[in-house]
Amino acid sequence: MTPRKLAHELLIKAEKSAQYSNITLDNALSKQNFSPADKKLVSIIFYGVTERKLFLDHQISSLSSRTIEDIDINTLTALRMGLYQLIYLDRVPPHAAINESVNLVSKKSAGFVNAILRAFQRKGSPFLPSKDNIEQYISICYSVCQPLASLFLRIFGEAETERFLTAINTANDITLRTNTLLCSRAQLLENIDTSKPTENSSSGVYAKGSVRDLYGFDEGYFFVQDEASQIAVEALGLKENDTVVDLCSCPGSKSFGAAIEMKNKGKIYSFDLHENKLSLVIKGADRLKINIIETAAADARINISKFDGIADKVICDVPCSGFGVLSKKPELRYKDPSASASLPKIQSDILDNACHYVKKSGILLYSTCTVLPTENEDNISAFLKRHPEFSLLPWKVGNIEAKSGMITLLPHVHSTDGFFIAKLIKN
């Protein structure tokens, strides 16, 4: 099995599966005895082709008389891989990109793949669509489905949509949250090559490479958490001996961050709808030497009366469309937003339940990893009308200031995931 052969197989599998791309890739790499360099090549090609699929297909359509639908998936995937390497991977020689792609297909298809890739090589630059149809232009150039391109254009306008999607398409470092129970951020920065501190969260570190191979992973010195999520936890203003309810906790990063802010003193109840996912929280807490988290399977929309009025802080990081994290979940680029139409009601129901757990003068934190107002500001406005005992509370973390109590973080503005945070107090 070669790295390109594995990438080819995984891309075909991803086309036919609803599984998240990171799970597909991680499961496959764990079964291969590849060198770090080979693992990196598989990851780059797999994610790169997934992220740029519509743009790559536009190149194929511009060079071939056959439609995309008429090309079998094995051949189409090999073409996408070859074009991705020719366009984006400067360190891969063109002859290697072409020959290795030809080797992935049958003899019957080899001539076709070779002809398309060599024709592109002769042209020397990608085909760009016309801007006359701006929705189609955005869809192809930034590789998002046309309904999603249309939605972003309505929310942001043309110029900001391009800035937003350019930032989404820019490769990001991994973001770590230092476990200050066990080590300092300075210690991580000193021992992890090419690392640098995050701009606003006080314990964040940008790093490169495989997470499990980084200094301090086995010792529990850090966990993976985007800076936006770290900012949300810091905005809570946690103290030692607080009682916290985390309603949609898996995979556990906000519960972990809260426990660290509380210096591992107090109590955190981490709930999730899916019991099998809670093992991630349990294992993560064990690695991080955190012992104040109690997990249980529960539907966040259904009240558990014994928790009414007990929490100093309640975290509602609700299920959402995920359109702020397209860089981490590239398969969402091709999801029609209409498929998420039921989410605002689910989010609203979770908020209506969560508010019962907040004690007087306690804090309710609502967050999503989307940029859609229907799941963010609109939900909060409607909640405040239903629950006048709550009000928005201004907050500031680093240079991020939410004077109104809520803010949408954007990758092209704040260098984070697209992320919404609202902080409310029970009066």
Descriptions of predicted regions:
Residues 1-427:
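S-adenosylmethionine
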